[in-house]
Amino acid sequence: MSVDLGMPVAPPQPLAPRRKTRQVMVGNVPVGGDAPISVQSMTTTVTADINATLQQIAELTAAGCQIVRVAVPSADDAEALPIIAKKSQIPVIADIHFQPKYVFAAIDAGCAAVRVNPGNIKKFDDKVGEIAKAASEAGIPIRIGVNAGSLDKRLLAKYGKATAEALVESALWECSLFEEHGFHDIKISVKHHDPVVMIRAYRMLAERCDYPLHLGVTEAGPAFQGTIKSAVAFGALLAEGIGDTIRVSLSAPPAEEVKVGIQILESLGLRQRGLEIVSCPSCGRAQVDVYTLANRVTAGLEGLDVPLRVAVMGCVVNGPGEAREADLGVASGNGKGQIFVKGKVIKTVPESQIVETLIEEALRIAEEMRAEGVPSGQPSVDVAG
């Protein structure tokens, strides 16, 4: 006799279908449509310092950044744009506030896109026609970047504060102005420091337009706090199929933003996994220094670009099981470590040789994977409990 527990025959898909949107091209990177979700960041240098800015862009590129934004608050910054746009390895977006003249300077400089903030550009609405014409002739998109911290005073007066409704109304109003001039190469962001408000705003926006959406939690905070806020907000939206490009905002070096963004996408299965270090959090059962082992293995394999899962475990309770599930792993205890490859113990080594052995085996497996044509991913680090 069977009992119907009301359970589905098969588990539901964890992610909703991707929201259908228009597609725009930011340089050679497609955003929206069926394009993969891209990861962006923003330089922290003075843009006018061309060498420093290009150096940071190179570091971001190496970290996996696909699109970079640079601030243009002054004439000196605007004058630096042609060289930066030409020499950057990835598409450059000019970030414009206050002065509409810098929008035209950025377009003339060859930037791949321009972000405008309708909340603080002087007489922005009056300039939309000219901006649309210039962007259309250059073949570049415009990001309408609405931010809770610089919302139009009229909307603040209407709603009392930067609500989700206020953010969406601002974005759609500006879109309508561009649409009046036949311009539709638009992507939108509606950023707020509160993930709950931000999630509500993007959900509303997704229901009311088909433009690609740039996800971001503004002023997210220091690295730990900002990572949590962004992971919560992005995870909720991306799981619903909302979002076409992301930027994690952290009070930290920009390359850290990129690493977090990539990790979020990998965690949702939205990007091919790269190197994944799985390590136990350590407890009273641990017979080795798991933290040191995991950090040394991570450092030794930094930059490895194949989807390889390495488990670093500190005891005999979960260690053997986790190590068997990984491509490569170690279960440590009693001054030694059992090295697993594809679930099988291949050797037992002294504790002093664990790191060296894992790195050697990882590099060997990586070479085999490359020879077999396994696609590259992006490096990531995961500490599992």
From Swiss-Prot:
Pfam families noted in UniProt: GcpE
Gene3D superfamilies, alphabetized: Dihydropteroate synthase-like, Sulfite Reductase Hemoprotein, domain 1
E.C. numbers: 1.17.7.3
Keywords in alphabetical order: 4Fe-4S, Iron, Iron-sulfur, Isoprene biosynthesis, Metal-binding, Oxidoreductase
InterPro entries: Dihydropteroate_synth-like_sf, IspG_bac, IspG_bac-typ, NO2/SO3_Rdtase_4Fe4S_sf
Cofactor binding summary note: Binds 1 [4Fe-4S] cluster.
Example GO biological process: terpenoid biosynthetic process
Catalysed reactions listed for this entry: (2E)-4-hydroxy-3-methylbut-2-enyl diphosphate + oxidized [flavodoxin] + H2O + 2 H(+) = 2-C-methyl-D-erythritol 2,4-cyclic diphosphate + reduced [flavodoxin]
Positions with a binding annotation for [4Fe-4S] cluster: 280, 283, 315, 322
GO molecular function terms attached to this record: 4 iron, 4 sulfur cluster binding; 4-hydroxy-3-methylbut-2-en-1-yl diphosphate synthase activity (ferredoxin); 4-hydroxy-3-methylbut-2-enyl-diphosphate synthase activity (flavodoxin); iron ion binding
Family of this protein: Belongs to the IspG family.
Functional description taken from the UniProt entry: Converts 2C-methyl-D-erythritol 2,4-cyclodiphosphate (ME-2,4cPP) into 1-hydroxy-2-methyl-2-(E)-butenyl 4-diphosphate.
Classification via PANTHER family: 4-HYDROXY-3-METHYLBUT-2-EN-1-YL DIPHOSPHATE SYNTHASE (PTHR30454), 4-HYDROXY-3-METHYLBUT-2-EN-1-YL DIPHOSPHATE SYNTHASE (FERREDOXIN), CHLOROPLASTIC (PTHR30454:SF0)
Protein name: 4-hydroxy-3-methylbut-2-en-1-yl diphosphate synthase (flavodoxin)
Gene name linked to the record: ispG
